[in-house]
Amino acid sequence: MTATGRVLRCLRQSYFENERSIMTLPTREEAYALLHEWVESESLRRHMIAVEAAMRAYAHHYNEDEELWGLTGLLHDLDYERHPDMDDTENGHPRTELRLFRARNYPEPLIHAVEAHATFLGVPAESLLDKALLACDELTGLIQACAYVRPDRDIRSVELKSVKKKWKDKAFTAAIDRQENMHFIEALGVPFDEHVQRVLDAMKGVAVELGVAGE
């Protein structure tokens, strides 16, 4: 890294630390308790934990704040179970959780990323955090499904080539829009194979929590 790059990083870290002193990021324990308070569905909890793992992996890759990125992933669908009607312009996902996050003075980068991941709201994905959340969100669901259909039901046995094969099979997890998600990955600026491998490896690290550590 050049001297200029180091200076810019220090300035960015100093700015972010100042922002964090004003805003309040919950601890992981607090965020996890909030998840259990709001979400009863085991599958949705697992999805949110999977996205958390992927976001932490990307934060590490980019030398960003792993707590901020991880908790953004963990909390991004907090109100979905209670308010799944996205056409409800008052309370529909993610409007209720955004009000909660603002009321609790959560960091603006977390709030903006959660808002931007609901593309129908029209909020542009601008930061790396925003773009990573979009690129990781639905891919974790496809990878989770890849583990579910394995005889051993173990995500640690899933390989990149298997995920790529299922990605091409549009009947598999048909609700996932491949074209839209490829756009998100391209916006993040990471090669497809590298992106899938990073998310897959991150999810393997939380196999037990995801319920895909083998029968």
Language model region names:
Residues A171-H195:
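C-terminal binding/interaction regions
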Residues Q13-Y15:
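Low-complexity, intrinsically disordered or signal/transmembrane-proximal segments
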Residues A3, V7, E17-E19:
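Acidic, Ala/Val/Gly-enriched low-complexity intrinsically disordered segments
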Residues E194-Q197, D201, E209-V212:
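Charge-biased, low-complexity intrinsically disordered regions
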Residues I22-T89:
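Acidic/His-rich, divalent-metal-binding segments that scaffold phosphate/diphosphate chemistry
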Residues Y62-K170, M182:
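Divalent metal-dependent catalytic cores for phosphoryl transfer on phosphate-bearing substrates
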